[in-house]
């Protein structure tokens, strides 16, 4: 259920785009993200840092799209978000000696430190490349195709990446974690 909750603004963007257009979809995504932040604050009393960052980026880039009536700003939004994730993953590990991927997953699985570092680096590289791929699609194909890619392409790539990581990491997960 959390997966659908997290994807709500993207799915709403896709639906509204198909029905009305890019500017209406951008406004809907901004509203949905603000609603998500408010809902998280009301129901749990806290808001996840990734959601706050996503909210700031959608308001800034979505707002610029609406204000200037230029869709290129909203097309940059996923790339900026992916690159912020890249900087966050690498910066936290290299500057603060804190592995964010490990922090998210270590309660579920146990692995040696070097494997956690490689996993963190793999995710950082994945987000970096996903940002470049988003720009490639945004500037070399139609807006219709970019919107489809934004939902289905990135979700598909994420799914394949997670499955690949799971298969590669399976040999490093302890027997206790597999039970």
UniProtKB/Swiss-Prot annotation:
InterPro entries: YciB. It is found in: Cell inner membrane. Keywords: Cell inner membrane, Cell membrane, Membrane, Transmembrane, Transmembrane helix. Coiled coil: none annotated. The keyword Lipoprotein does not apply. Pfam families: IspA (PF04279). It comes from the Bacteria. Its main location: membrane. GO terms for cellular component: plasma membrane. It is a multi-pass membrane protein. The keyword Cell inner membrane applies. The chain crosses the membrane at residues 3-23, 49-69, 76-96, 119-139, 149-169. Belongs to the YciB family. NCBIfam families: ispZ (TIGR00997), PRK00259.1-3 (NF001325). Plays a role in cell envelope biogenesis, maintenance of cell envelope integrity and membrane homeostasis. This is Inner membrane-spanning protein YciB. It comes from Methylobacillus flagellatus (strain ATCC 51484 / DSM 6875 / VKM B-1610 / KT).
